[in-house]
């Protein structure tokens, strides 16, 4: 039996591998990757590489083995994920894996925003497959905001259409730790975890925190969804993705990313990373 992680060279995947290496012998860890060269650092740490491309299902035939515990990290190509995930689920079923854990989105089948559609479809694919599953319904990453600090600092404004909605975010490392815990621990089969930070915050509070830490005046500027979408497209985002992001903001305004179930802290055995900690780390890197 091996612990297998797909998307192992991505931002979340690399952190999951780090977590696994802290508790599991490297020889029991497998990284499924598209590009062997990109994964050279993982191989150097003793992680087995299995090369496969989600867009070419035939390459997935050797990605999994009977008894493997598999972490399916959701793909990053919005619009292609259902087909890609379907190929992985089929390959995992054919191999007879012991567990398929999937990183979905907060709310699962009840999530009512565009970004959730592919995640909901993937969860249904997994349920229909009959595979032993664990659903990791990830909330918002704090890094979704802190990765875009440059324009915020330049213009002195956090621009969004999220109203007074609150966001129970956590760091990417928190979600990685939970994923590692689920594929290395027991008692998680058939479970769906609603993962989010311990504390929800508003964008006005986020702007106030940025002001406090930087010493600059930064405000939350609420704009209509259509205007926000125009701003995002003007900044270079594809129109479809900009529409998804403004739709997420509307979901935030409705309270869809504010839930604090405590599942994330329980799985990791520690409090989630505070917003201020991630903000300070990001500012130090700007």
Where are these regions (language model features)?
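A short hydrophobic/small-residue beta-strand
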Residues: 49, 99-100
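Oxidoreductase cofactor-interface core, primarily capturing Rossmann-like NAD(P)-dependent enzymes
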Residues: 2-38, 55-61, 65, 76-86, ...
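Redox-cofactor binding/interface segments in oxidoreductases and associated redox assembly factors
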Residues: 52, 69-73, 102
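A short helix-to-beta-strand connector/capping loop
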Residues: 44-47, 131, 216-218, 269
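Rossmann-fold cofactor-recognition segment
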Residues: 43-56
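A hydrophobic C-terminal alpha-helical subdomain
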Residues: 226-286
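Short glycine-/small-residue-rich Rossmann-like dinucleotide-binding loops
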Residues: 53, 74-76, 283
